[in-house]
């Protein structure tokens, strides 16, 4: 199972920003525990719970967590954090230095992980690309020449290749886990104030509306609620019908509503066709079903990547405008005016939302929800939290820009280091297709003419299956190595499978 523990620099950066905004130790710790997810947030939630429920002071609660946590770096950080607070009262300087130190360590660790990924990629290319190709050629030639059983060749194609690829993908998932997403929904009723909470006391913040008391709905109210729910469903359906392309780009998996029935229909037609071999039916169904999803996911990933690349510069523009004394709404308008990339549309929509009377932070929450990547959500949450203790708008967005740029540099370094191996896998697969042409068009025909007892048809079928299965396996591995996840793997698999299927049909026709 993948380790979803975020980097230690994440809580350190959050605490540093909160202390810089003049928040107390209790407020800073509680803020991170409430607004983050993962191992560190869970540990700090225990300290907050002990303070609120057991009456312990925050120093004792964090000291207990430091003594019980099973993460040595986090344990050391908490001990140093407590010592700094007790001795100097303000841990801002320590947190700044610790953050710089952790970012250097994380960059070094990422370089080591990229080196390990390169080793895994070389193993996969050597064993499951070149090795499989060599094994297929050897077992094919020996089996046809000796007239033996095709079982060894079938074991390689139908057993070793898919199982080995699955093991490789699992190892990559453990070595390079996906980042932990923050809380998905940000539409809280939050209006930051400059009120400060007494340290160590769990008082209610004035910016949070109290929870509504539970009550029994009347029959009329229940009828109205049901009508509203039906209206929401109708509105979503109407929005989809008005602009299906836009909705599909937001949620590519919805395309399966159309592609899955189309794939089933195509499969039935091909299955009952007397001229199409059955081994071409399943690959064709796979392509019809998954190609639209792969293309839409590719467009979505490209736009998201461009947005993540632009986000640090947008945060810096907002921070720079705030330094000149502009309110947050004007800072957002300045960012929308200066930006010319993919975020311009979202920034303009946010500014328009505010101009129509929307609350600034609620509009920012909706902006982050639309972007839907961790750095945007974390920055908006952080800005809302620091707004309770400081009127300095520049601080959270400058911190968000630094955090986003650091995360982006780590991911970019990993992707650039793996592109070479993705290219090698593509080249190796097309070499496999070329070998298929040679073996099917020259060698097998020559052996069939010289030895009529050889069952060349079965070997030719296994060779065709090897090309098709190899295309799917190489595509999934290429997607994982490029850092795009399962959707990227499906895209590469569709490209390679389409090439392999076209080559196999050409061999069958010729």
Task: Enumerate the predicted regions with their spans.
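Bilayer-spanning, highly hydrophobic alpha-helical transmembrane segments
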Residues: 108-172, 257-266, 284-290, 406-480, ...
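Loop-to-transmembrane boundary segments
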Residues: 117-124, 207-265, 416-424
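Hydrophobic alpha-helical transmembrane segments
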Residues: 59-80, 94-113, 225-235, 362-382, ...
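Short, charged cytosolic
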Residues: 84-104, 204-237, 387-402
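Juxtamembrane/interface alpha-helical elements of multi-pass membrane proteins
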Residues: 1-66, 76, 185-215, 267-369, ...
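Membrane-helix interface "capping/anchor" motifs
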Residues: 300-303, 480-490
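Juxtamembrane boundary at the C-terminal end of a transmembrane helix
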Residues: 502-510
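Membrane-cytosol interface segments
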Residues: 158-245, 297, 323
